[in-house]
Amino acid sequence: IIRVLRAQGLTNLVTRSHRELELTDQAQVREFFSTEKIDQVYLAAARVGGIHANNTYPAEFIYDNMMVQANVVHEAWKSGVHKLLFLGSSCIYPRLAEQPIREEYLMSGALEPTNEPYAMAKIAGIKLCESYNRQYGTDYRSVMPTNLYGPGDNYHPENSHVIPALIRRFHEAKAGAAPEVVIWGSGRPMREFLYVDDMAEASVYVM
């Protein structure tokens, strides 16, 4: 998103890394919004990871994401931010939803068990934006990207997503002359992937 905005000639961008601003800390988020003069917010921050991370740390996935969303949305509203874009996840839809998935399928069935806590947090983020819009007249929008890939991805073996995880496994197998590469699952499910810059352009357009 930053690359797209800069390519459009915008220079007044305010960013913070996780080390600079802990979004689960309401006091820090309140101080940030009271100090900076923000008119639009792209809420892309989240605790994310693959199947292993979601299975291992379900409490962190639901708590951290709900805290980040609640703090940013609430403090943005309190400081007068009228426009906000919340990036959710396609895992909010039921595991057995009819294909192609339609927006109205949200909360119409059971979620995928492996990432249910993360999905519940993202659903809460959507409802948070809808509730502030209804009560306070804000323009807080939600978009649900599918599996993203591209520059700046995370290749950590514990919490990477499927494409960087596979790239790392094949690279390490090649470098170590391994006789095989283990890939989880049956190989039958179909996955959808979206290039990160395409998602960024769509996010700026929706905002």
Predicted features, each with a name:
Residues 16, 41-47, 84-90, 143-145:
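SDR active-site strand-loop-helix element
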Residues 25, 40, 68-71, 83, ...:
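Conserved cofactor-binding/catalytic machinery of classical short-chain dehydrogenase/reductase
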Residues 26-66, 75-78:
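NAD(P)H-binding glycine-rich loop region in Rossmannoid oxidoreductase-like domains
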Residues 68, 72-76, 128-129, 202, ...:
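Hydrophobic positions on the long internal alpha-helix
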Residues 70-115, 141:
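Conserved Rossmann-fold NAD(P)-dependent oxidoreductase catalytic core, especially the SDR/UDP-sugar
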Residues 117, 121-124:
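Active-site helix of classical SDR
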